[in-house]
């Protein structure tokens, strides 16, 4: 394998055995691709904005004399870039401009004569844009739109599994779900009649909808039933025989023909009888007259002479009717074929309960059901029914819906109309009846072929369409209002409804969520999340077990492990590593094609529906060198079941062992040895890890770390290869390789790094360069590490030396004992940044003022403020300190106009202001690292604001000037090359000032042209620089667009350094979580024979019952990795020659099966080997991919090479007594995370505070400054102790006895410690509740 210069710095030893057939795809593509589809111009008009516009336009006036047509749209440039939007608190969006054409037709002239056409570009609101990392900046905060898993449109056949009716009878139903429009349900009731519901309203007999579609009773019976034809000959009744229909019945008479008796009366008719009848070609048999009684007529029979109806269709025949028919001369009688087994009389029975008899009455019935209480007219009823399922404006199945609909009904074509046809409805009813008759299966709702993904783009498009439809109504009104000659398209369109709809979606939809930004993994997982909740989805309360459960079709599409614990379990899922959505929005996963028993590298993506038809081998099936299966029988999946298949039957094979799990779960090493419940916790807790001060790569990883770090976007990645020309803390400059340059550009890439910014979770985002001057860079190399990344690999925690042993009860019940060394070395120290804002408003009594002149505040409190009343940067502040001084006018009295005038003239003001300064919250302390002042346009800026502005201008100018100098240097280097190549001597050229170089002329015309081009570029560069500087200046100096009534906003950023302390929560990656119980002095920690103490002591009892053995294997492998690092470190210290070093490192990389990774250190230069050794001396990082990890023998081999006992256990000594422990202890390196549940944020105490309104009890929770609840069980405890007085004060004065507590306060102030308990308020609440039930209850004085 070829490594780039940057990759050679540290190579992770890979224990994977299976070849990597497919690279991990870009992890954010589900978000980016979907949004790209939304805003991209689509000439077909299938997707995105284009589709929305085409579906609503053209809009015609009611009279048809004019229409507004859509031509095209374009998105403008955003005003501010992403970072500016975050600082200013605005939305990162672009203006949408649409070209519309207003066409006015002549009134009197023939159809379509155009009188006037006006075209104009109209502004239609702002569309929020996605940042390159798949997020949206809405009002300054980063948000993510989570994809939704919802029921696919189409038709679904289902049953209630016998739960509805008490008899336990299974009732079947069918439901046609459109993408938008009314739902249509068909269902059987316990009496086997078929009913229909529209939009889940009350049910009507299903035949009503057929009547409304203009079918007569005869036609309905004809559609759903086969006929049995009776003939009357010579006063005998004969029946046309279809032998197959008799199977399974008991003969009620002798079946005979041509004098031969085939079946005797009372015998059951079997397949043998039927074969005989067919063989003898029997078509007519004589039946007794009684046999026809109870049969149902299939059509109307009318007496032709009189015209009266003898027998209507769907009437039961009787002997009287038979006689009448015979008299009227009917020789053939058509009846319906039904039996109890597989041809039930359902539709015939339904017709009997149907109150309607023609189209109009059916339409009226439907109208009454949809609009109860409104008087139906024929026209209204027809319109309503027409609009329900047959109007493209009101109903749309969508392409997906039509495809699913046609597939479900076994049709060949998959495209078709978005509205329903008569045929569609009839075929659905036929299929439902077939299922009731026992032919066909019901659908599985939880099958991923019946649930599809709705991503950002699609949801945004739907919202946009909603806005457009609102506009459409207004436009129709305006087009009809008359004087169109004066109007332009702009006057028709009001952009407000559109921007309101879009804004509402991005700002407050259930699926638009505040991004989880704890660390890079939590960002990526949040963007790859799939929720079944949200508009049009499920609700937590209604979702049962089945929906939440893991389904066989989840394999390779949705992770079976990563889902939240609690009420949302199984409703919120995570996309698997390789999964993607297809054009219809169904999830698909890649497989390798198997042809003639040979596994090829050809990759096919299969959706859940397609997968059902194939036999798919697992990724860990053994293959020989040619790609054939080694074993005869291979474990495969087919139709949702796993079993053994012969190798010739296999169609596909999994791509990778980790294709089952999500990104979060794929980062857990030895996942295959963990119980699933604990793995779930492990995957979820990695997302809560707080970035530490110095990131430390995991010694034991899975090989996914790099992909996550790079794709998350927290690192800075090289867009093009080149050479590092300049690097400092805030920018990296790359001189681009010649072959990657665009013709005629300077060939310089500048990367500006983010420093100390606040994340959504108040953690710190800061980038640090990880390349040095002069290093060669390739495209895709990591240039700078972000939070929680180390040399381009995800690094959520720290490698800690752990021992599994009890230690004096300090690790009872999952507590964790930590060494003081961990605190000294700042291993788990993290920086948290808080933003506090002070808003100065314009009140009725006058403006609030930000000032250092605050009434009744001492000098000491103002010592950290400048003259404008704003805290200095660098000030260390603690709870209660003033950050921004602010006074608010106090209104004792509303002043009369005369007084106002006098006040204005003599300006006495100080008397009536109150202090409303921004103070540091009680539990917070830290350092002020930044202050931002935003001033409304037209309000005078204070001194501090001007200082900040000047500083920003200086910084911007410096940045741009440096950028210009760098680009100029690059350009002049190229000009120099051209001139020298054109024959100018280099020495002379050096003496000439650079500005004069461009005046030189060259004889070679091509070179001269090149020179002129470069000169042009130089001028362009300078002009561009001036333009950029001017734009920057304008942005910085202009006033800010603040909310109405706000004059100024001051934002203060505090940085807090949090060391680890008892009460903080820590965890490993295997769901092994605990709370720190004690920080122990180093000298008291257990130590080994070399005197090395351990960092953390964990309880061994936490392992067996939880079955997460992965942590033990990780510990052993970590120990081995560290052992090898120690050996390399010793060799470096002894300054051994490079050859020995190279040989030892090569041995480490060659150890094990190594089928996937080959590292050849002979291709490395000595410097590269030394740099690799420097990076490996803290431990050799290893990767054990999920389900394909290191084997026991490999771990033992590595332990041996590192000079560690292969048992992984060593003798430890007690740090306090120096005695050795009698048994050997498992010691090794485990990757530990500090989770974002810090004791600092949870510590809380209350003195006097606020009370709840009704119960008068103290509120609960830290945010409300609440008290501790003394609950039911605590009361029992005091009762058990017999502590009556303590209990009394708990239940009265300390809680909700209002008079008692005020009295007590007075007493304490007066110095007497008396208490008089009274009536608790909650008792009064109880009395009132009892009275509200109508029971009078009174307290009587004794």
UniProtKB/Swiss-Prot annotation:
GO terms for cellular component: DNA-directed RNA polymerase complex. It holds the Pfam family RNA_pol_Rpb2_6. It catalyses: RNA(n) + a ribonucleoside 5'-triphosphate = RNA(n+1) + diphosphate. CDD domains: RNA_pol_B_RPB2. DNA-dependent RNA polymerase catalyzes the transcription of DNA into RNA using the four ribonucleoside triphosphates as substrates. The RNAP catalytic core consists of 2 alpha, 1 beta, 1 beta' and 1 omega subunit. When a sigma factor is associated with the core the holoenzyme is formed, which can initiate transcription. Belongs to the RNA polymerase beta chain family. This is DNA-directed RNA polymerase subunit beta.
């Amino acid at each position: 394998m070829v490594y780039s210069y940057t990759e050679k710095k540290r190579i992770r030893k890979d224990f994977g055995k299976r070849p990597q057939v497919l690279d991990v795809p870009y992890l954010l593509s589900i978000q980016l691709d979907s949004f790209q589809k939304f805003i991209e111009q689509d000439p077909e008009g299938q997707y995105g904005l284009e589709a929305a516009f085409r579906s609503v336009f053209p809009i015609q006036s009611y009279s048809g004399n004019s229409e507004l047509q859509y031509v095209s749209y374009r998105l403008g440039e955003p005003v501010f870039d992403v970072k500016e939007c975050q600082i200013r608190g605005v939305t990162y969006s672009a203006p949408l401009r649409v070209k519309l054409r207003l066409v006015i037709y002549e009134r009197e002239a023939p159809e379509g004569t155009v009188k006037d056409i006006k075209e104009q570009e109209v502004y239609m609101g702002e569309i929020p844009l996605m940042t390159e990392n798949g997020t949206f900046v809405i009002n300054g905060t980063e948000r993510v739109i989570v994809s939704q898993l919802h029921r696919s449109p189409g038709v679904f056949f289902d049953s209630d599994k016998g739960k509805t009716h008490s008899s336990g009878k299974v009732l079947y139903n069918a439901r046609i779900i459109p993408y938008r429009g009314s739902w249509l349900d068909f269902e059987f009731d316990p009496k086997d009649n078929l009913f229909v519901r529209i939009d889940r309203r009350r049910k009507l007999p299903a035949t009503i909808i057929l009547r409304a579609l203009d079918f007569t009773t005869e036609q309905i019976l004809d559609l759903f039933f086969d006929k049995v034809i009776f003939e009357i000959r010579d006063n005998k009744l004969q029946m046309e025989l279809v032998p197959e229909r008799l199977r399974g019945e008991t003969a009620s008479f002798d079946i005979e023909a041509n004098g031969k008796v085939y079946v005797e009366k009372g015998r059951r008719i079997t397949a043998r009888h039927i074969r005989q009848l067919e063989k003898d070609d029997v078509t007519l048999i004589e039946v007794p007259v009684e046999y026809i009684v109870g049969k149902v007529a299939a059509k109307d029979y009318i007496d032709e002479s009189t015209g009266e109806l003898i027998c209507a269709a769907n009437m039961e025949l009787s002997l009287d009717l038979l006689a009448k028919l015979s008299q009227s001369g009917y020789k053939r009688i058509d009846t319906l074929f039904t039996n109890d087994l597989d041809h039930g009389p359902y539709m015939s029975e339904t017709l009997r309960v149907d109150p309607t008899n023609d189209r109009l009455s059916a339409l009226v019935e439907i109208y009454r059901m949809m609009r109860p209480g409104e008087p139906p007219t024929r026209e209204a009823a027809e319109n309503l029914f027409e609009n329900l399922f047959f109007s493209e404006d009101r109903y749309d199945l969508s392409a997906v819906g039509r495809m699913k609909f046609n597939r479900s009904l076994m049709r060949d074509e998959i495209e078709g109309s978005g509205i329903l046809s008569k045929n569609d409805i009839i075929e659905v009813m036929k299929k439902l009846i077939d299922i009731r008759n026992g032919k066909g299966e019901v659908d599985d709702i939880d099958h991923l072929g019946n649930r599809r993904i709705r991503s950002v783009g699609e949801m945004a498009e739907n919202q946009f369409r909603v806005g457009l439809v609102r506009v459409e109504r207004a436009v129709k009104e305006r087009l009809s209002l008359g004087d169109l000659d004066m109007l332009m398209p702009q006057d028709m369109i009001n952009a407000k409804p559109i921007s309101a709809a879009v804004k509402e979606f991005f700002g407050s939809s259930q699926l638009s969520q505040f991004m989880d930004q704890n660390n890079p993994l939590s960002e990526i997982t949040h963007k790859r999340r799939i929720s079944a909740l949200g508009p049009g989805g499920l609700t937590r309360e209604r979702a049962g077990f089945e929906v939440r459960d893991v389904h066989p079709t989840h394999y390779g599409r949705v992770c079976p492990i990563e889902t939240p614990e609690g009420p949302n379990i199984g409703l919120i899922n995570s996309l698997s590593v390789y999964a993607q959505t297809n054009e219809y929005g169904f999830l698909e996963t890649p497989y390798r094609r198997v042809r003639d028993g040979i596994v090829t590298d050809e990759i096919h993506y299969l959706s859940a529906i397609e997968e059902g038809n194939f036999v798919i081998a697992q990724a860990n099936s053994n293959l020989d060198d040619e790609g054939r299966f080694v074993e005869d029988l291979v474990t495969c999946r087919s139709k949702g079941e796993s079993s053994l298949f012969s190798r010739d039957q296999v169609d596909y094979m999994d791509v990778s062992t980790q294709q089952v799990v999500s990104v979060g779960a794929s980062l857990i090493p030895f996942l295959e040895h963990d119980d699933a419940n604990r793995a779930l916790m492990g995957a979820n807790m990695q997302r809560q890890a707080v970035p530490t001060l110095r990131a430390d790569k995991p010694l034991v990883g899975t090989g996914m770390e790099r992909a996550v770090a790079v794709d998350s976007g927290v690192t800075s990645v090289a867009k093009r290869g080149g050479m590092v020309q300049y690097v400092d803390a805030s920018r990296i400059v790359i001189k681009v390789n010649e072959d990657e340059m665009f013709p005629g550009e300077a060939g310089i890439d500048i990367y500006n790094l983010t420093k100390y910014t606040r994340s959504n979770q108040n953690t710190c985002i800061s980038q640090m360069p990880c390349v040095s001057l002069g290093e060669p860079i390739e495209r895709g190399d990591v240039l700078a590490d972000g939070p929680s990344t180390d040399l381009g690999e995800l690094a959520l925690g720290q490698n800690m030396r752990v021992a599994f042993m009890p230690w004096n009860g300090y690790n009872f019940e999952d507590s964790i004992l930590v060494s003081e060394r961990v605190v000294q070395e700042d291993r788990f120290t993290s920086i948290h940044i808080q933003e506090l804002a002070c808003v100065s408003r314009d009140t009725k009594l006058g403006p609030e003022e930000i000032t250092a002149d605050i009434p009744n505040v001492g000098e000491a409190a103002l010592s950290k403020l400048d003259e404008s009343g704003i805290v200095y940067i660098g000030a260390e502040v603690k709870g209660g300190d003033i950050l921004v001084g602010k006074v608010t006018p106090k209104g004792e009295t509303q002043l009369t106009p005369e007084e106002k005038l006098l006040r204005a003239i003599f300006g006495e003001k100080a008397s009536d202001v109150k202090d409303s300064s921004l103070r540091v919250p009680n539990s917070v302390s830290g350092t002020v690292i930044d202050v931002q002042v935003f001033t409304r346009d037209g309000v005078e800026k204070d001194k501090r604001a001007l200082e900040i502005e000047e500083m920003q201008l200086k910084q911007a100018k410096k940045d741009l000037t440096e950028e210009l100098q760098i680009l100029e240097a690059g350009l002049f280097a190229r000009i120099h090359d051209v001139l020298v190549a054109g024959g100018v001597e280099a020495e002379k050229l050096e003496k000439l000032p650079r500005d004069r170089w461009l005046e030189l002329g060259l004889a070679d015309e091509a070179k001269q042209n090149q020179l002129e081009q470069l000169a042009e570029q130089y001028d362009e560069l300078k002009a561009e620089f001036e333009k950029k500087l001017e734009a920057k200046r304008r942005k910085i100096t202009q006033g800010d667009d603040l909310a109405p009534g706000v004059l100024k906003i001051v934002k203060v950023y505090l940085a807090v350094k949090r060391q680890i302390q008892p009460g903080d929560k820590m965890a490993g990656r295997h769901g092994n979580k605990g709370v720190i119980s004690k920080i122990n002095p180093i000298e008291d920690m257990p130590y080994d024979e070399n005197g090395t103490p351990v960092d953390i002591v964990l309880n061994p009892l936490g392992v067996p019952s939880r079955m997460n053995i992965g942590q033990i294997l990780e510990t052993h492998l970590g120990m081995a990795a560290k052992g090898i690092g120690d050996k390399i470190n010793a060799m470096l210290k002894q300054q051994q020659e490079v050859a020995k070093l190279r040989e030892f490192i090569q041995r480490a990389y060659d150890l094990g099966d190594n089928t996937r990774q080959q590292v050849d250190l002979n291709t490395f230069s000595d410097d590269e080997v030394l740099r690799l050794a420097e990076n490996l001396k803290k431990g050799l990082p290893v990767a054990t991919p999920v389900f394909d990890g290191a084997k026991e023998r490999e771990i033992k081999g590595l332990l041996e090479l590192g000079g560690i006992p292969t048992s992984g256990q060593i003798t430890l000594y007690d740090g306090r007594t120096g005695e050795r422990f009698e048994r050997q202890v498992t010691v090794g390196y485990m990757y530990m995370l500090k989770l974002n549940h810090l004791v600092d944020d949870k510590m809380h105490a209350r003195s006097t505070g606020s009370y709840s309104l009704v119960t008068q009890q103290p509120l609960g929770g830290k945010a409300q400054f609440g008290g501790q609840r003394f609950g039911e069980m605590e009361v029992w405890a005091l009762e058990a102790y017999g502590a009556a007085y303590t209990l009394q004060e708990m239940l009265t004065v300390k809680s909700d006895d209002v008079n008692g507590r005020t009295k007590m306060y007075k007493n304490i102030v007066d110095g007497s410690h008396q208490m008089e308990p009274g009536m608790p308020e909650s008792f009064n609440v109880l009395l009132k509740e009892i009275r509200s039930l109508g029971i009078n209850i009174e307290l009587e004085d004794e």
